[in-house]
Swiss-Prot record:
Protein name: Magnesium-dependent phosphatase 1
Means of activity regulation: Inhibited by vanadate and zinc, and slightly by calcium.
EC primary class: hydrolase
Pfam families assigned to the protein according to its UniProt record, in alphabetical order: Acid_PPase (PF12689)
Enzyme Commission code: 3.1.3.-, 3.1.3.48
Catalytic residue list: D11 (nucleophile), D13 (proton donor)
Residue sites binding substrate per the record: W20, R70
Length: 176
C-alpha cells in the first residue's frame, strides 16, 4: 500500500463548505428539526456533498484530520464544525486570522508530526505557496473537497515520499 500522511489538514471556507463563514452567512447557526443547518436568517448552510465521505475515508485509513482556517469568524466556524458533526474527524483545530504558516507550526508543535508527513487541502493559492515551503504536500482545491481530489492528493503525497516535495500548483492533476 502507498505511504499515507500522518496528518491531513483542511482549510474550511471553499474547501469543506461553499462560502466564507465571515461574510456570506450570518451566525449564529442552528440545526432545524429536519436536520438542516441554517444561519440566523434561516438560510440553508451546507457542506460540499462529498465532504463527510472524504473525512470518513481518511478516518478508515487511520489518517487523523485537522482544520486550519484564517477566518475571523472563529466561533461561527467552530459552531458549523459541531453542527455538521465534524469535530470527531479533527484532532486539532487552528482557526484564527493570520498566516497559515503559524497554523502549521502550531500543528507541528502539538502533534510532533514532521511537515513532510502532512498533506494540506486549500482553495487559496497563496496558502498553498506558503505552506508548501515548509515541506507539506499541498493540494489546491478548485470546486470543494471531494473523493477524487482526496485520491489524487494521497497519490501526490505518496509520490512526494519517493521524490522531491512539490505543491499541486506546479504539476496539478486538478487543473485543466
Amino acid at each position: 500500500m502507498a505511504r499515507l500522511p500522518k496528518l491531513a489538514v483542511f482549510d474550511l471556507d471553499y474547501t469543506l463548505w461553499p462560502f466564507w463563514v465571515d461574510t456570506h452567512v450570518d451566525p449564529p447557526f442552528h440545526k432545524s428539526s429536519d436536520g438542516t443547518v441554517r444561519d440566523r436568517r434561516g438560510q440553508d448552510v451546507r457542506l460540499y456533498p462529498e465532504v463527510p465521505e472524504v473525512l470518513k475515508r481518511l478516518q478508515s485509513l487511520g489518517v487523523p484530520g485537522a482544520a486550519a482556517s484564517r477566518t475571523s469568524e472563529i466561533e461561527g466556524a467552530n459552531q458549523l464544525l459541531e453542527l455538521f458533526d465534524l469535530f470527531r474527524y479533527f484532532v486539532h483545530r487552528e482557526i484564527y486570522p493570520g498566516s497559515k504558516i503559524t497554523h502549521f507550526e502550531r500543528l507541528q508543535q502539538k502533534t510532533g508530526i514532521p511537515f513532510s508527513q502532512m498533506i494540506f487541502f486549500d482553495d487559496e493559492r497563496r496558502n498553498i505557496v506558503d505552506v508548501s515551503k515548509l515541506g507539506v504536500t499541498c493540494i489546491h482545491i478548485q470546486n470543494g473537497m471531494n473523493l477524487q481530489t482526496l485520491s489524487q492528493g494521497l497519490e501526490t503525497f505518496a509520490k512526494a515520499q519517493t521524490g522531491p516535495l512539490r505543491s499541486s500548483l506546479e504539476e496539478s492533476p486538478f487543473e485543466a
